[in-house]
Amino acid sequence: MKIIPLSLLFLLLICSNWGFSQVNPEFDGSRAFSHIEKQVLFGPRSITHPNSKNLTHDYIVNNLKRYTDKVTSQEFTAYGLSGRNIWATFPGEKSPDIRLMIGAHWDTRPQSELDENKANLKTPTSGANDGGSGVAVLLELARALTFDKSPTTVDLVFFDLEDLGNIDDLPFAIGASEFVKKNSFYRPNKGVIIDMVCDENLLIPKELYSKKYSRQLLEEIWSIGEELNVNIFSDKDGTFIQDDHLPFIRSGLNVVNLIHYPFPDYWHTTRDTIDKCDKESLSQIGNVILTLIYKQDKT
């Protein structure tokens, strides 16, 4: 009989455990928070502030390129406006043909029409929560995905020109609509749009377009929330919301919208600032999405 040294036995046990159980990478809410800080520092990411938008665009692209070489910036023109959607792909290791899209808008609203101070009505929002938080979550997901390859392909998509709805008769989700038109070949198996997800009192009900057209995916996400014991999901119904998920739903795709509702009282005001954002809320929504990603080869 050959005697195995205790140190070697311990190492073998560790390796054996690693082989039988996969620990998903963890989402870092503090890192996500720092991405919001950076965006706010650039200034409003609205059509009225092209320099801030260019800085933010390059910041997103350069961060993504640290983690994948599959990054594209797609220019488009709609309603006389120019925009850019950013698309990063992380190929799956086991089932690359199965695709999961995670999306968020990266622009901010060019006015604060709900501000209590009438002098601010034409002032662009800072967009820390509405715009900044979704981008922050996607950028931290990109980092997390490099630690353990996803079993299925993940697409992170940053949509431009989402937040122009009801301004000069413009619709919401212009960039997402253009993305669907330009990439008609793209048919992800599932998709999640996240919006306004950093409030310290984050509460996400079941958005009604999502419930009507993608109920199973919505229930899958709520089940993960229960599994992780997060407190950001409500079993109550929300309302029908115009957001970046709708162009995908209209094209027959299985996409849901995770959004804080009722909207915070600083929504579309100059008070949508970094002090409204919470690292724990970012951690909770981020870890739910990460868990969803790593479960896809089992569903």
Predicted regions and their residues:
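Positively charged n-region of N-terminal signal peptides that target proteins for export
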Residues: M1-S7
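Boundary at the C-terminal end of the N-terminal hydrophobic targeting segment
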Residues: G19-S21
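Acidic/histidine-rich catalytic neighborhood of metal-dependent amide-processing enzymes
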Residues: K122-Q216, E220, I232, F240-I241, ...
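A non-catalytic alpha/beta surface segment that caps or lines the substrate-entry region
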Residues: S34-S95
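Bacterial N-terminal signal peptides
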Residues: S7-S16
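Extracytoplasmic/secreted proteins, especially bacterial periplasmic and envelope-associated proteins
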Residues: R31-K38, L55-R66, S133-E140, I174-E178, ...
